[in-house]
Design a protein with these regions (language model features):
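Glycine/charge-rich catalytic "coupling/switch" loops of P-loop NTPases
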Residues: 258-303
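Catalytic Walker B motif of ABC-type/P-loop ATPase nucleotide-binding domains
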Residues: 156-159
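ABC ATPase NBD coupling module
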Residues: 65-80, 103, 222-226
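Helix-to-loop junction immediately C-terminal to a conserved catalytic motif
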Residues: 48
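Conserved catalytic motifs of ABC-family nucleotide-binding domains
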Residues: 152
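Conserved ABC ATPase signature
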Residues: 131-135, 139
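Conserved ABC ATPase "signature" region
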Residues: 102, 109-127, 178
Length: 303
């Protein structure tokens, strides 16, 4: 449904996105994670037609949204956007949520019903006449989410939706994201500084580094089989050892400074690799009691 093909974006001669490519299917939750300044917010703004790419293409349902002006307006109406710092008007909650509906020419009677329904979805039923600017940060973010969802978008874009929120508000927003996707089938693309939030919520994760996706995969793939040393370090793997692939009794092993570690991954002999070792992958036993088992790695140690 959403295709990113070599998307580039520069500001004042500095390239922020240097060829971002990915495919997001209808009904998926796609998380964009990456270091600060990696271009996560820029990418979402390009998808939402708030900025224009320097190069490459963004296609939604096969339409290049930045090349086809006639289609861009129609496509934009298919999308809702929630920003990191939600902007609310100095009026009631109901008036804030109704803005997009009025732009679309919806009749007042229908607007009232849709606003009430949207507030119920985000857990703010009865808030219609509250002044929006008197709400807490978490409540404001839920109002922003209701405002985005009241237009019934096919695609929901969320830029750091839980940044600076307290843990209770974070949990409520995360529950809403899952429920909206599950119940309405909405395609959701969100950026986050919290990589574990991506792990909890997303079907696919894109790790944005150095202007490109260094890896796109399921949470399990990204966190247990990182595509590079850089990705491994970013997702929190600290024990990374360099080695060279060697043949070992008909199987593959990695020679890491004299210690051979067997691997199930299909590797090519003499290939230089990096081993990512997690504490949960290790078992410690006293040296005198250590036993060897076929296919298991046993490392020598002292009492």
């Amino acid at each position: 449904m959403i295709e990113l093909e070599g998307v580039r974006k520069s500001f004042d001669g500095k390239e922020v996105l240097a060829g971002v490519s990915a495919r997001i299917e209808r009904g998926e939750i796609f998380a964009v994670i990456g270091p600060s300044g990696s271009g996560k917010s820029t990418l979402l703004r390009l998808i939402d037609l708030l900025d224009t790419p320097t190069g490459g293409a963004i296609r939604i349902n096969g339409v290049d949204i930045h090349a086809n002006r006639e289609e861009s307006h129609r496509v934009q109406r298919m999308m809702g956007m929630v920003f990191q710092k939600p902007a609310v008007f100095n009026t009631t909650v109901a008036e804030n949520i109704a803005v997009g509906l009025r732009f679309r020419g919806i009749k007042e009677a229908a607007i009232k019903a849709k606003v009430e329904e949207a507030l119920a979805v985000v857990g703010l039923a009865g808030y219609e006449e509250r002044r929006a600017r008197t709400l807490s940060g978490g409540e404001m973010q839920r109002v922003a989410l209701a405002r985005a969802m009241v237009i019934e978008p096919e695609i929901l874009l969320m830029d750091e939706p839980t940044a600076n929120l307290d843990p209770v508000s974070v949990e409520k927003i995360e529950e809403l994201v899952v429920r909206i996707n599950r119940d309405l089938g909405t395609t959701i693309v969100f950026s986050t500084h919290d990589m574990y939030q991506g792990q909890r919520l997303a079907h696919l994760i894109g790790v944005l580094m150095n202007g490109r996706f260094a890896q796109v995969g399921t949470p399990r793939e990204v966190f247990t089989h990182p595509a590079s040393r850089e990705v491994a370090r970013f997702v929190g793997i600290e024990n990374i050892i360099d080695g060279v692939v060697v043949a070992s009794n008909g199987t593959c092993a990695v020679d890491a400074g004299g210690v051979r570690i067997r691997t199930r991954s299909p590797l090519t002999p003499e290939e230089l690799v990096s081993l990512c070792i997690r504490s949960e992958d290790l078992r410690v036993t006293p040296a005198g009691e250590a036993t060897t088992a076929p296919g298991k790695n046993t490392l020598p140690g002292d009492r």
